[in-house]
């Protein structure tokens, strides 16, 4: 499911930003963001209750098709929180084969390198919800565990024919205050400015990093939302300035 959650101001030529869901499959966090000055679309996981395994590559191909149905050609930005940042990276790789769409940048919002080798049965991407029907909580928690398995099998894309889009990491400034082993996994690379990516996946996966307020699970809380909103506005504007003009490529 793709949903437009913000519209660009009249007269603006800002490129659209597509944000991918976290491991729960939901996009509710993005609704808290302040105005970003561009069209913003959020993609939720419409198959959260579906049975069977799906690779991140397969899921990303579905999302590529969704975006193409919205923007057939031109320049776009991709991003997301946690799992959403990794999905953005994979979808960007798919778009590198598309001559009609240019990805100007990838925005990873506190998306730590997915090293869950020692905690596949524990590593939840976000805390289980205490709200809503028990069946809904069960579906979400199952989806989170499936995500950990999916990331364990994921082969991080390598750009060979085209350069990787400019990729920026927004890093939460605080650790999660929890004794839960699963929750602490999001902080295992907190000392790295790229949250473990450049040390473990290659020296140029993440080009820049910016600090934001809060810990992994409080980024979108009211007290922190201005920090992440302002940083996203700054980063996405810079990405557009660095991107080649459409008519130079097409």
Curated annotation (Swiss-Prot):
Enzyme Commission no: 3.1.-.-
SUPFAM superfamilies xref list: alpha/beta-Hydrolases
Q: Tell me where on the tree of life, at the top rank, the source sits.
A: Eukaryota
Instruction: Spell out the InterPro entries in the cross-references.
Output: AB_hydrolase_fold, Thioesterase
Q: Is S-adenosyl-L-methionine one of the keywords UniProt gives this record?
A: no
Biological pathway: Secondary metabolite biosynthesis
One molecular function GO term is: hydrolase activity
* Keywords for this protein: Hydrolase
Q: Which GO terms describe its biological process?
A: biosynthetic process
Q: What does this protein do?
A: Thioesterase; part of the gene cluster that mediates the biosynthesis of the lipopeptides W493 A and B. W493 A and B consist of six amino acid residues D-allo-thr, L-Ala, D-Ala, L-Gln, D-Tyr, and L-Val/L-Ile linked to a 3-hydroxy-4-methyltetradecanoic acid polyketide chain. The biosynthesis starts with formation of the linear polyketide chain by the highly reducing polyketide synthase PKS40. The gene cluster contains a putative acyl-CoA ligase (FPSE_09184) for formation of a CoA thioester polyketide.
> What is the recorded name of this protein?
Thioesterase FPSE_09186
Q: Which organism is it from?
A: Fusarium pseudograminearum (strain CS3096)
Q: What lineage is this protein's organism placed in?
A: Eukaryota, Fungi, Dikarya, Ascomycota, Pezizomycotina
């Amino acid at each position: 499911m793709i949903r437009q959650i913000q519209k660009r101001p009249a007269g603006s030529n800002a490129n659209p930003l597509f944000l991918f869901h976290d491991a729960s499959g939901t996009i509710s966090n993005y609704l808290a963001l302040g105005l970003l000055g561009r069209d913003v679309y959020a993609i939720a996981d419409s198959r959260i209750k579906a049975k069977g395994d799906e690779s991140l590559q397969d899921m990303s191909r579905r999302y590529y098709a969704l975006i193409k149905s919205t923007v057939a050609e031109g320049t776009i930005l991709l991003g997301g929180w946690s799992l959403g940042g990794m999905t953005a990276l994979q979808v960007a790789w798919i778009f590198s084969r598309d001559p009609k769409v240019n990805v100007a940048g990838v925005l990873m919002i506190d998306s730590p390198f997915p090293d869950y080798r020692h905690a596949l049965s524990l590593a939840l991407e976000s805390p289980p919800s205490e709200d809503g029907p028990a069946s809904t909580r069960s579906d979400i928690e199952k989806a989170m565990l499936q995500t950990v398995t999916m990331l364990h099998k994921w082969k991080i894309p390598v750009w060979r024919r085209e350069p990787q889009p400019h990729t920026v990491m927004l890093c939460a400034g605080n650790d999660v205050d929890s004794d839960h082993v699963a929750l602490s996994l999001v902080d295992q690379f907190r000392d790295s400015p790229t949250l473990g990516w450049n040390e473990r996946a290659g020296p140029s996966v993440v080009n820049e990093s910016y600090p934001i307020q809060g810990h992994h699970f409080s980024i979108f809380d009211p007290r922190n939302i201005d920090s992440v909103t302002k940083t996203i506005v700054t980063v996405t504007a810079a990405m557009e300035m660095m991107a080649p003009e459409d008519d130079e490529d097409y």
